[in-house]
């Protein structure tokens, strides 16, 4: 047993416990916060400090007490950290929304980084020896689910088996050349429109021969090959049938195709129970196959036979779920517990203390804002989940976890630790299902961290952690795992960065399915504003997406700014909304050095005093022109007073923002500060803005605006 150490209070105030989103605005981390080192160890680095509780490291659960004692002898410091931190509670606190404290700095010290990269990852837990010391009773009980299935038939009818276990080495080598080396174009093979569901789908297959798993399709989950314990839990909670939308979505998910699904509203959370069901089904099938093959190998050994059964990757974790906040993580873990059928959950109290906070933003804020920032909106976490036949362990070591849930920034700080000796990425080498949920929130934080994670995903490990190479699949050894990894992406609305995750960074040979909402002129955002205000869409020429920022900037300073006062009916109350922070800096510098405009500028980095002062001066007319960024609006959702003319330097990525920005003018009209007929909204766009344009004007109008001869369109 590990020695017991007396825990000390770290003396950090409750106000310092709150971690905000300031870090996510920066690509790199900078200065240290000495006063919060211990606190950050305790709360913010939620990454598996329980080495003394979890040292089997096997892809099945075997409790080896002797191995635990040996492992802990060399880890006194880790054990000390564990005991100091494991039961410190994060008390519910009063959350102030819309203040600078909500966007606190997350600059961590070196010792903080040590905690991320060390305590949860560097634990040697005999990874790879997963077929030793297996309880044969456990094998039998695990196999009970499939007593009625014929093993040979299952290989041809179960997408899990056909996707991961049937592809030949020659086939994968051929596809690797076409997909990864030659970058051959993927083929669009099917387009479907579901008018009653208001969505459409597009199916793409890789060049050459697709994997072609058995494409099961049914409105009943019982007709899919789902583990009994998961199916029973799901049907007990949600019934035996599926809605038309659920059936349409679950089909490509269970058939191991990549999926990009836009759920349109935060209120639509049905998709979450579908992907958690799939994740659990995948974990339990992987475990079941390993147990059965281990039994076969033991039997063959007794009979002096030689068998080659490959059923594993380099490391145990098979599912990675990326989420924006601890509250989102809490909800997903609760869903996993609900569907897993586990009788007990280890470290559940600690998890609740660190991930759950009963807090909601003010009722005056929009509903989507209140949902995004409710509960514990700390964006720095990383936690492993380990399943046994009857229990779930939270805070398991990464190398002994089945599922890892993490924020992109929390994970990237482990992958790219400033101390190169402590960088770790091996635990991501064998991820077979990647799930990215609430992508729009993650993008508003910092999408660069997602790109960092993708860079290390399915990378051949630096060390092999005692892996049994006789059990590792050849496509893992040959660095072909990314060809079989499934990627599931869920977002409220599509953006180029999110679209790129499936289009350019996923290579699943089973194919890709992209779902898109059908937005016509009737249900478009423009039609829901409720104000008959002049809206002018001005198109400018842009030769490529890479040249688009420069083309937009040149058009703005040469065509829009010089005529701004002439086209506007008012000399004051001019707001320029700029989605990109880099474009914002560029325009701000030009206004400062090359014009005589009396202007103010506020962004997500502005202090609270500057935000208040600038808004007051703009509302009073002292400042004639105001620069305003999209990320500031996302994090604060201000209602700016005094707006009479609105210039959108670019279209907002969130269509709701379009309505909210235009209603700034409606507020001025209501206060009789301007005339509705004289107010003006002008939007700059290019043909590369088609995705954002569709969300605002509809699928029918967007192609016309992007491709017709006319460059200017007016709507009311």
Swiss-Prot record:
Keyword rRNA processing: yes
InterPro entries in the cross-refs: P-loop_NTPase, UTP25, UTP25_C, UTP25_NTPase-like
Residue spans of biased composition, Basic and acidic residues class: 15-26
Pfam families found in the cross-reference section: Utp25_C (PF06862), UTP25_NTPase-like (PF22916)
Comp. bias intervals (Acidic residues): 50-69, 110-150
Keywords: Nucleus, Ribonucleoprotein, Ribosome biogenesis, rRNA processing
GO annotation, biological process: maturation of SSU-rRNA from tricistronic rRNA transcript (SSU-rRNA, 5.8S rRNA, LSU-rRNA)
GO cellular component annotations of the record: nucleolus; small-subunit processome
Gene Ontology terms, MF aspect: rRNA binding; U3 snoRNA binding
Cell compartments where the protein resides: Nucleus, Nucleolus
Start and end residues of each stretch annotated as Disordered: 1-167
Source species, domain of life: Eukaryota
Subunit structure: Component of the ribosomal small subunit (SSU) processome composed of at least 40 protein subunits and snoRNA U3.
UniProt function note: DEAD-box RNA helicase-like protein required for pre-18S rRNA processing, specifically at sites A0, A1, and A2.
Family: Belongs to the UTP25 family.
Protein name: U3 small nucleolar RNA-associated protein 25
Organism: Candida albicans (strain SC5314 / ATCC MYA-2876) (Yeast)
């Amino acid at each position: 047993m590990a020695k017991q150490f007396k825990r000390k209070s770290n003396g950090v105030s409750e106000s310092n416990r709150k971690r905000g989103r300031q870090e996510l605005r920066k690509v790199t981390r900078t200065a240290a916060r000495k006063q919060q080192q211990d606190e950050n160890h305790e709360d913010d680095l939620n990454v598996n400090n329980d080495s003394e509780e979890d040292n089997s490291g096997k892809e099945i659960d075997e409790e080896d007490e002797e191995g635990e004692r040996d492992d802990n002898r060399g880890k006194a410091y880790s054990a000390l950290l564990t005991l100091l931190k494991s039961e410190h509670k994060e008390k519910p606190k009063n959350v102030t929304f819309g203040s600078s404290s909500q966007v606190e700095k997350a600059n961590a010290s070196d010792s903080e980084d040590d905690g991320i990269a060390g305590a949860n990852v560097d634990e040697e837990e005999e990874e790879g020896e997963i077929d030793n010391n297996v309880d044969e009773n456990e094998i039998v009980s695990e196999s009970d689910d499939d007593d009625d299935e014929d093993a040979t038939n299952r290989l041809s009818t179960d997408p899990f088996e056909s996707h991961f276990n049937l592809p030949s080495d020659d086939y994968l080598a051929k596809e690797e050349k076409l997909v990864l080396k030659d970058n051959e174009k993927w083929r669009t093979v099917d387009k479907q429109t579901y008018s009653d569901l208001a969505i459409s789908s597009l199916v793409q297959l890789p060049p050459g021969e697709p994997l072609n798993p058995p494409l099961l399709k049914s409105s009943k989950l019982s007709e899919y090959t789902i583990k009994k314990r998961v199916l029973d839990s799901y049907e007990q909670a949600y019934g035996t049938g599926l809605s038309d939308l659920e059936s349409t979505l679950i089909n490509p998910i269970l058939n191991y195709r990549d999926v990009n699904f836009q759920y349109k509203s935060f209120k639509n959370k049905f998709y979450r129970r579908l992907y958690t069901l799939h994740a659990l089904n995948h974990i339990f099938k992987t475990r079941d196959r390993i147990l059965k093959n281990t039994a076969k190998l033991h039997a063959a050994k007794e009979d002096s036979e030689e068998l080659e059964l490959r059923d594993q990757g380099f490391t145990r974790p098979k599912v990675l779920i990326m989420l924006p906040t601890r509250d989102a993580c809490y909800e997903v873990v609760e869903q996993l517990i609900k569907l897993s059928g586990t009788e007990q959950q280890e470290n559940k109290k600690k998890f609740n203390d660190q991930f759950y906070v009963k807090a909601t933003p003010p009722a005056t804020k929009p509903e989507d804002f209140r949902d995004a920032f409710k509960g514990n909106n700390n964006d720095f976490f990383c936690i492993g989940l380990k399943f046994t036949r009857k229990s779930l362990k939270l805070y398991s070591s990464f190398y002994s976890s089945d599922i890892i849930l993490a924020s992109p920034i929390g994970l990237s700080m482990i992958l790219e630790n400033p101390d190169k000796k402590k960088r770790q990425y091996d635990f991501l080498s064998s991820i077979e299902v990647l799930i990215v949920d609430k992508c729009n929130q993650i993008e508003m934080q910092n999408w660069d961290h997602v790109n960092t994670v993708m860079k290390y995903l399915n990378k051949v490990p630096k060390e092999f952690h005692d892996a049994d190479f006789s059990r590792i699949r050849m496509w893992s050894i040959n660095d072909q795992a990314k060809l079989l990894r499934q990627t599931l992406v869920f977002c409220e609305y599509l953006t180029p960065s999110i679209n790129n995750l499936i289009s350019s960074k996923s290579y699943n040979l089973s194919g890709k399915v992209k779902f898109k909402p059908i937005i016509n002129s009737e249900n478009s955002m423009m039609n829901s504003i409720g104000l008959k205000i002049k809206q002018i869409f001005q198109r400018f020429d842009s030769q490529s997406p890479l040249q688009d920022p420069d083309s937009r900037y040149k058009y703005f300073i040469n065509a829009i700014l010089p005529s701004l006062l002439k086209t506007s009916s008012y000399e004051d109350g001019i707001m320029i909304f700029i989605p990109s922070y880099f474009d914002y800096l560029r325009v701000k510098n030009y206004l400062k050095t090359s014009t005589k405009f009396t202007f103010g500028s506020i962004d997500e980095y502005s202090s609270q005093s500057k935000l208040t002062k600038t808004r007051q001066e703009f509302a009073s007319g002292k400042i004639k022109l105001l620069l305003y960024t999209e990320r500031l609006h996302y994090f604060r959702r201000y209602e700016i007073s005094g707006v009479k003319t609105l210039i959108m330097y670019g279209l907002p990525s969130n269509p709701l923002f379009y309505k909210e920005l235009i209603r700034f003018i409606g507020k001025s009209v209501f206060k009789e500060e301007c005339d509705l007929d004289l107010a003006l909204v002008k939007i700059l766009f290019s043909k590369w803005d088609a995705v954002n344009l569709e969300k605002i004007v509809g699928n029918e109008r967007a192609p016309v605006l992007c491709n017709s001869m006319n460059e200017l369109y007016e709507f009311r």
